[in-house]
């Protein structure tokens, strides 16, 4: 750590503020920034700020895609975790940069909650070395967990390169036949209660699972409460 990075632990600062705190010239400041790989610059003109990257488990950048109404995924942004803890810089596909003190607002609905969220948390806790209590997960824990989430996303968001690759290579699921629903639903309900299957990030406390099944009006993705 250096004096520069120590100052940035509290959050983004402008060049004039940093130069004043460090009592250095513009030339010296430029050299300091050039030597610090984790110091990033964002904004334009007088709105330019400097921030300190905060890699999480070796990850500095988390790409995000948005799935449109036609089922096509489009690159939306890159998220870079920064200091202070929980904050991030989001660079849109159009180059627009925005600072967030927590999860970007459009991803907050993806935070695990309710019955399925707890089941998902228990399933991933041992794998990711996280606490089983999803209420104790920090912002970076949630983002990291979302990169390995293999269910269906609320709002059509794909977080992480791995999920994008799974999306574009996924095969269309086979619908549960009408005459086999009872057997399949009993097993899915049992698995859901055991925390072994999570097909959605839907919230709520009532036990439930999601699946793709035949219905009188055609094959549909359904949310089954029991």
Residue ranges and their predicted role:
Residues 2, 8-226:
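Phosphate/dinucleotide-binding and metal-coordinating scaffold of catalytic cores
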């Amino acid at each position: 750590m250096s004096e520069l990075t120590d100052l940035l632990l509290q959050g983004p600062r402008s060049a004039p503020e940093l130069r004043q705190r460090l009592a250095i010239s513009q030339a010296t400041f430029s050299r300091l920034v050039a030597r610090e790989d984790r110091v990033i610059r964002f904004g334009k003109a007088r709105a330019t700020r400097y921030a300190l990257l905060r890699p999480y488990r070796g990850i500095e950048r988390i790409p995000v895609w948005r799935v449109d109404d036609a089922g096509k995924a489009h690159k939306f942004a890159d998220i870079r975790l920064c200091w202070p803890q929980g904050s991030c810089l989001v660079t849109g596909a159009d180059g627009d940069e925005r600072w967030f003190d927590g999860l970007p607002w459009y991803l907050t609905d993806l935070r695990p909650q309710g019955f399925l969220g707890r089941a998902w948390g228990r399933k991933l806790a041992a794998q990711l070395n996280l606490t089983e209590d999803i209420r104790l997960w920090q912002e970076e824990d949630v983002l990291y967990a979302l990169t390995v989430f293999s269910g269906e996303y609320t709002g059509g968001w794909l977080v992480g390169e791995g999920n994008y690759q799974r999306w574009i290579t996924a095969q269309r699921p086979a619908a549960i036949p009408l005459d086999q629903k009872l057997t399949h639903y009993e097993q899915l309900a049992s698995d859901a209660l055991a925390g072994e299957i999570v097909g959605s990030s839907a919230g709520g406390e009532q036990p439930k699972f999601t699946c793709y099944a035949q219905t009188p009006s055609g094959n549909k993705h359904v949310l089954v409460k029991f």
